[in-house]
């Protein structure tokens, strides 16, 4: 018998702890199949070991919460003429927006699909000669800028590429345009090659003189969404108590 196991992205201790239960249950259902018929033949093993004790749907996560919040804000501002997204999730935020308006998506990674209301272009937002100046009046970049310059998705290694990306996005947006922006927040650091984590104080300096902050929301360490948070000195100083949270800014270009 050919015995192939596919386990992807799973910590070793999880595998060692939960795999015996998986094998026991596999033997049990094989025995049931022998007695009840073999309408479904068994193929390779595909263990899913981490989901048994999770809440249904996995909804309370950074992406799920930010995607819904920002899509709702764009829906309320639907009078804006051209929305462009930079690197956000196609199967989350972009899909939400495409349900009620057209959206242009720019990403360093390629895509092969044809979906109504989504227009894709492969582009590197950290290119020094990036064009499209004053191109749109609505722009989003959700949980993407933290990857700039770290090579995770085939992009170049450059310690300061988040600054290049910031400048290119600023040039792309028209004056008075809306910018919806999110990144991980907490003590400032790089966890190579996954992502950067930004302190809130750094982000405020990062945007100073470029944008007015219309609202700030965040997802905390317990995956709770707090909307319209006040950016007071104490909260900014301790990153709203986050080690790895998600800061979500609604901005207007000056």
Question: What do these predicted ranges mean?
Answer:
Residues 1-82, 93, 192-210, 214-250, ...:
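N-terminal accessory regions of S-adenosyl-L-methionine
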Residues 59, 150-162, 190-195:
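Short, flexible/disordered intra-domain loops and linkers
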Residues 77, 96-98, 174:
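Short, conserved loop/helix-junction motifs that constitute active-site signature segments
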Residues 82-130:
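Class I SAM-dependent methyltransferase SAM/SAH-binding core
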Residues 128-139:
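A short acidic, Gly/Pro-enriched loop at the edge of an enzyme's catalytic core
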Residues 157-175:
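A short glycine-rich, Lys/Arg-flanked "PGG" loop and its adjoining helix->strand segment in the class I
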Residues 176-184:
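Conserved beta-strand signature within the Rossmann-like core of class I S-adenosyl-L-methionine
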